[in-house]
């Protein structure tokens, strides 16, 4: 981040999609994160099938716009033109809960289908990376345990589902 971070040295990166958090500066118990899925939708905007991408954000409107710009969401931004849709699955959870839930959904729905190094498109629109390494030995133990606590809780819930419908 260097000097691009601005005058406030305590501020988190203003664009967490483009800026990374390699040192884990966002505390796992920080609130205000949302887990969402990207779905194909019918003409009425209802989801068809399982999500093809799972993500987390602290601003769903901004993130939806970024997905339209990248090609992961189709349409020009008008609701009536969309063939895909961002649907919140969990709102206002902690960062650690969001990471755990996100990884559980990625695993459950098999959305890690994106090809690293290839442009995002409607053909290459799945997750390219896992939310976090469930076997990490380098992450602070309490942080890893917090992520895993919510990964395990959501995995258990998803394993009990019938018909693969997301549960909020």
Language-model-derived ranges and their functions:
Residues 1-28:
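Short turn/helix-capping motifs enriched in Asx and small/polar residues
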Residues 26-168:
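Catalytic toxin/effector domains delivered as secreted proteins or via bacterial secretion systems
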């Amino acid at each position: 981040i260097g000097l691009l971070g601005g005058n406030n040295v305590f501020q988190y990166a203003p664009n967490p999609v483009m800026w990374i958090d390699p040192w884990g500066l966002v505390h796992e118990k920080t609130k205000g994160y949302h887990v969402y899925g990207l779905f194909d939708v019918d003409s009425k905007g209802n989801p068809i099938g399982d999500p093809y991408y799972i993500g987390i954000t602290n601003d769903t409107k901004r993130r939806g716009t970024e997905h339209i710009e990248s090609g992961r969401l189709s349409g020009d931004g008008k609701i009536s033109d969309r063939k895909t849709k961002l649907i919140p699955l969990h709102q206002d959870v902690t960062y650690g809960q969001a990471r755990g839930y996100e990884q559980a959904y990625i695993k459950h729905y098999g959305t890690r289908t994106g090809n690293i190094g290839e442009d995002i498109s409607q053909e290459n629109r799945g997750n390219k990376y896992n939310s976090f390494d469930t076997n990490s030995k380098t992450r602070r133990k309490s942080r890893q345990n917090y992520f895993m606590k919510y990964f395990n809780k959501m995995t258990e819930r998803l394993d009990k589902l019938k018909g693969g419908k997301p549960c909020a």
